Amino acid sequence: MLTGCFTESFQDVIDMSENGISPFGMRAICDFSQSGILNDLLPLDILLEILIFANKFCCERLKEACDRKLASLISSRQDAVDLMECALEENSPVLAASCLQFFLRDLPDCLQDEQVVRIFATANKRQRVIMAGNGCFSLYCLLSEVAMDSNPRSEAAASFLEKLVECAVSNKQKQLAFHLLGCVRLLRKEYDDAEHLFDAAVAAGHVYSVAGLARVSCLKGHKLSSYEKLSNVISSYAPLGWMYLERSLYCDGDRKWEDLDKASELDPTLLYPYMFRASFLMRKQSAEAAILEINRILGFKLALECLELRFCFYLALEDYRASLRDLQAILTLSPDHRMFDGRVACTQLRRLVKEHVETWTTADCWLQLYERWSAVDDIGSLSVIYQMLDEPDAAKGILYFRQSLLLLRLNCPRPAMRSLQLARQHAASEQDRLVYEGWILYDTGHCEEGLRQAEESISIQRSFEAFFLKAYALADSSPDPSCSATVISLLEDALRCPSDRLRKGQALNNLGSVYVDCEKLDLAADCYTSALKVQHTRAHQGLARVHFLKNNRKSAYEEMTKLIEKARNNASAYEKRSEYCDRELTKGDLEMVTRLDPLRVYPYRYRAAVLMDGHKEKEAIAELTRAIAFKADLHLLHLRAAFHEHIGMWLVLFGTAGLPSLLIPTTRRCLSSKTE
């Protein structure tokens, strides 16, 4: 009737059956036309009828209301799948966005569902716009990354990256999309397609894709061509670490060593040079030197490949306790990890190694944890906690929480969040669960919500962790200096509650910091001294600060020296000690910091400032540029811009930090190559 000439309106009985709407649905539409509200009790099938009707006859208000009502009914993945298909067919962006939100919250698990993968992999341009509007490229970037993280050779990863190429509009987007799809094609041994994609990325201006072209050339038997490609890049652009690393794969002997050393000099964060040198030393029976070499990178970058290699070294030396430590650290970072190119499950290796290691009791484990925590041995602490979690009667909530603290300290945010979620899942009580939820909220930027969870936990039962969380969140959320008194009171309440000395030491240390901020130096010193009595080694740093503020620079220096001697990971201690000595000693300490942890930016800023003071502007800028090449830190970029402005050079400066690395292993086959 509605699409005709309305002749039916003269009839006593009007046939509505051809309009795809039931009488019940039509009555709901009639009610909406009078009230502007859809009935809350309408079933799903009627809402779908109404949506189709509204779309067919351009009833925009009705369609929007129906969209929102349907969006509120999504309660399962299957609901989201069914409604997404309807939303794409009926051009309903609100409903599509709600379904998409459900899928994104369900990542990465939802990508194991073929229906979900099919929706994203087969969506055409119109459907992608309905789902994500102008954010299509970002959406497929995320989906591609998740799929590649799970299995870079999978059909899902390839399909999502093909869509990413279709979504790419700007030159930068095309560079990234072509390069990543080229990497996946290469891993799938589709060499011609990979070469074509890397060529397209290079043509779009992505210099790094030359490395992909070199890999393809080598696999096709043209090793010399690969070497020449990288040599041309090195001669044409400002040299960067990855250029020398990639070229080292296509040469031998002294040239290989020179390229690897140059790669480490330009970018000390690259894993392969350390791994190659360590493997070479191990083959030469220099086990101690090999372990020292691999420890150089593990001192500031907790990489699974390097832990794997060190595990192999210790296994060859029959040091089973150290082997077990590294295995348990690997399993903490990646519970389903498989070693030796995926052939052996890490859990299986752990069972075999454990047979050669004396079993620790629960009391032994706690003693070992105290010892390693006090020695700032974070990898060792992770291993002990993993072993404690393996016990049938373990207090898993507390242990997973401790694990998350260590992982955050090691700059591993994703495993840390997983551990926090496990802590919440295994919480022994409602008040503990609220505390762990509070930390999850705090760590994801929802400070006020985290504070409320702490308060609710305290209302159930006063506990150390609840007071500690509240103090921590309050100190961070309130810029008002007057809140210091409240934070002090909360930390004192925490210290009155039962806890172990690891956490008490942390609370005392934090309390000392608040007292320092309030200029109550004697009280701060008392807190730090008490923390040291329970072996909270980092309290040396706070005590040094108190000495310094009391104009006792020598005592501050000596206090930091004690921390350096005790801590296994002591780059930050050297950095702090540099503040309490003269310029020459400062220079030495900061050089040590850069050797131990080249990712710490303060030494570069200090050296650049000293050079600038000496009117060595070019050298100062070069010092900052050296660090920016592998760590695009905001402070370094601002400082370099200020230096350029000072010398009258108004330039827009771009680094290559942050370029995606090739998804091609440079470990197994390359490590086993012989060196002349």
Label each residue range with its predicted role:
Residues 1-75:
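Canonical BTB/POZ domain core
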Residues 42-48, 61-160:
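Alpha-helical protein-protein interaction/assembly modules
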Residues 145, 183, 215, 249, ...:
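Residue-level recognition of tetratricopeptide repeat
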Residues 150-151, 188, 220, 250, ...:
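Structural motif corresponding to the intra-repeat A-B loop/turn of tetratricopeptide repeats
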Residues 157, 194, 226, 256, ...:
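Single-residue signature of alpha-solenoid repeat helices
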Residues 161, 198, 230, 260, ...:
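Hydrophobic/aromatic packing residues within the alpha-helices of TPR/SEL1-like helical repeat arrays
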Residues 169-172, 204-206, 235-239, 268, ...:
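Short coil turns that delineate tetratricopeptide repeat
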Residues 177, 209-211, 243, 273, ...:
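TPR alpha-solenoid repeat register
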